[in-house]
């Protein structure tokens, strides 16, 4: 059985890693970042849900009466 030649594996793996790094750098460099990021003012009091103001009862399926 012939021996597996692994002499080119190092070059192949290193060139693949280098190519991936270059591709990722190019993708990141094309991304548009905002110039002046500002904080959004979030008011939680403006959005009230009906279940926050009143008590609701949750029925489990097994606690309901049997239907035949």
UniProtKB/Swiss-Prot annotation:
GO terms for cellular component: mitochondrial membrane; proton-transporting ATP synthase complex. Its main location: mitochondrion. Keywords: Acetylation, ATP synthesis, CF(0), Hydrogen ion transport, Ion transport, Membrane, Mitochondrion, Transmembrane, Transmembrane helix, Transport. It comes from the Eukaryota. One of its GO terms (biological process) is proton motive force-driven ATP synthesis. The modification N6-acetyllysine is found at residues 54, 57. It is found in: Mitochondrion membrane. PANTHER family: ATP SYNTHASE PROTEIN 8. This is ATP synthase F(0) complex subunit 8. It comes from Lemur catta. The lineage of its organism: Eukaryota, Metazoa, Chordata, Craniata, Vertebrata.
């Amino acid at each position: 059985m012939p021996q597996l030649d692994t002499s080119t594996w190092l070059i192949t793996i290193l060139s693949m890693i280098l190519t991936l790094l270059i591709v990722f750098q190019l993708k990141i460099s094309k991304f548009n970042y905002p110039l002046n990021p500002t904080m959004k003012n979030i008011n939680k009091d403006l959005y009230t849900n009906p279940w926050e103001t009143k008590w609701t009862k949750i029925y489990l399926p097994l606690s309901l009466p049997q239907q035949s």
